[in-house]
Structure formats: C-alpha cells, structure tokens
Amino acid sequence: MTSFQPLHSVTSQSLTGKLQGFHEALLADYPHICRLACAIYDKPTDVLKTFINSTRQGHAIAGYEVKLHDTPSLLHLANHQQSRVIDDISAEIHGGSVHSDWLLEQGYMSSFTVPIIRQNQFLGFVFIDSVEKDSFTPSIQRDLIMRCASICDAIANELAAAHLLVATASAIRSIANLRGFDAGMHLTRMAELSRLIARNLPAHFGLTDEDIEHIYLFSPLHDIGKIGIPDAILLKAGRLTDSERQIMQTHVQKGVDMIDSILADFNLIEANDARIMRNIIAFHHEYLDGSGYPFGLKGEQVPIEARIVTVADIFDALTHKRPYKKSWSVENSLTELHQMVEQGKLDDDCVTALANSLNAAQHIVTSYCDSEEPASNPGY
C-alpha cells in the first residue's frame, strides 16, 4: 500500500489569503476601507453565495446565499456589467432582508460594488465597504476597479481550474462507461449533503466559505477510483467476499493516483484546492477509531473534509434503495449514524450538524431521486 499522509497545508496561498494581502496593500492609500468581500454566482441555480472576505471591522457574513433574480439591484448590475456606489448606507439601505439587516448592523457608512466579469460572463461581485460616508469618489472608483482586476483574475482562474478538474474527472468516469457506477443522483446528493454538514459545523473547525465551496465541488469525486474496479465486484448485488472487499478497497489508491495525474497534467498539484480534493478521495473511508481503510487513521489524523464526506456518503447509502438493500427513513438513518458516533467511528460534530438540519437533509433526499439504474456497491 502506498503511504499517503493528510495534506493540511500547501505552498500556494488561498484566495482568502490573497484577498487579505490585497486589502492590506489597499489600506496604505485608503485606510477607511474596512471590508472586502467576494460573492460568486452559480448560473445553473441562479444562486449568489458568499465566498471570501477580508474584514477589519464588524463581523463577516458567512454561509449566506440568495437567488440573484430575487435581488433586482444586483441583477441590474450583473446584466449591465455596472458598478455601484452607495454614499450613505444608513440613508439608502433599508432593512428587511438578511443581508440588508446585517449590513446596517456593521456600522459601515458607504460601499462600492464591482461585478466580476470575465469573457463577458458574470461570475460574482466584489463588495468594498468604508467606515466613512462619501468615500468612493469617481477617481477612487476608477483606481479600485483597476486594482480589483488582479483579485478578480485570481478568483476567475481558481474557479475555472476547479471546474476543469471536476469536468475532467467526470469525463473520465463517463468514458469508462461503467454500467450503474454512481448512477442516479448520488453525486448531486453528495455535494449537497457535504455542503449542508460543512455549513453547520461549529466555528472552531475554521471552515471558510472558500473551503465549503471546495468541499461542495469535490465531494462528488470521492469514489472516482471505482472506475478501476471490475464490474463483477463493483455492481455485485450482495455482500462482498473478503477477497472482493480487498479489491474494492484499492479504489481509494486508484483515485488518489488518478487525481494526482490530472493535477500534474494541469500543473495544479500545489493548488490550495488540491489539498481538499486529495484528502476527500484518500480518506473518506477512514473511521476515527482506526478501523477504516486503507490507512487506518485515527481521530484528528482524519481531515475534517474527509469526515464530512464520510458522514454524507453513509447517510446517502442508507436513505436510498440499492440492489442489496431497501431505503431507510431519514430518522432511522440518523439513528444509525449516532450509533456509529458512539462506536467511535464517525465525527460527532458532523453527524450533529446533519441532524440539526433535518428538514434540509430530507429535502435533499427527496429532491434528487434516483432512477431505477443500479448503483455501485459501497464496499463498507
């Protein structure tokens, strides 16, 4: 077995770190700018969601998303590729929405909003806030737009790279043409469930919106190595024999090798988001008591992103019908997860985060239903 250690840091700087450095440099000329934040747009769902921020005053808003078409003022900016200045927030912004109420509570006095546009595509917004009224004169606006180009490029490039990695891995999976491999909506549910858990974890885990977005993007790749497992084992409609289970468990190392090859091809092996991707693929079958595979990691050795995906994967397997089992109710599935916590296998915070979001979990289970196609054997 190839040795593989959890990656807790990489040499490249995260987008959050880059934004904080950009803010630090900006303060030399504009000391009144107390907050920079970027929200990204997901076109298929019309969702605008918080992503990265550098906040010197007030409390950062995190885990917030809204339909762009439900915010006419921002929709106008996106459609017309225009920036916007609010010279007096207290006079021009009225409460009533989560974001407006939050903005008024922070004590910011003026703001400047710049759309992120690349290749004529709207990707999101940069929000710049000041502790002074009338901070953003026309000349300052022009300067900030030019300066923001670098951070906008960084965001656009990283999002493009992340989506390219996912698309490449998905293409490999499709080319393999494995009948029933992760059929139906399993991968969509994995992304949604993993994000749900990550968003509801206690603050001490330190997950940023940037981290959560990467977990959302990369959790569907957790079992990518299964494309190297023979169909007779992958699609077996019953319990695996010991020898079959050993072969099934090699999908983890196969997945790591595959993703490392893709990362190397795109020169992304040191990218910050590569850490989360590799940890998910390598460690999503590890249990906290050391009884998992293939590395037998224990406790804190298992990265939080892997613990999240493990809980999401088991929950999804329990709540959906498979050739070898009937579907369980959400309530019974959560009971099973809690029992696995008591056995020392699963992270208590991750299971609690899911249990505390019962309605959202139920919505994911019922909204993304499987077809009648068979799914791969999880090999647990």
What are the functions of these language-model segments?
Residues 135-156, 213, 304:
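Amphipathic alpha-helical "output/dimerization" segments
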Residues 109-117:
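A short, aliphatic-rich beta-strand micro-motif
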Residues 24-27, 35-66, 72-74, 220, ...:
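GAF sensory/regulatory domain recognition
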Residues 58-98, 104:
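Regulatory sensory and allosteric helical modules in signal-transduction proteins
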Residues 167-380:
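Histidine- and acidic-residue-rich, metal-dependent catalytic cores
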Residues 124-135:
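Short beta-strand-to-loop transition segments that serve as allosteric relay/switch motifs
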Residues 1-17, 21-25, 171-184, 198-200:
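Short regulatory/linker helices and ligand/cofactor-binding micro-motifs at input modules
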Residues 139, 154-171, 267:
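Short alpha-helical interdomain "coupling" segment at the junction between an upstream regulatory sensor module
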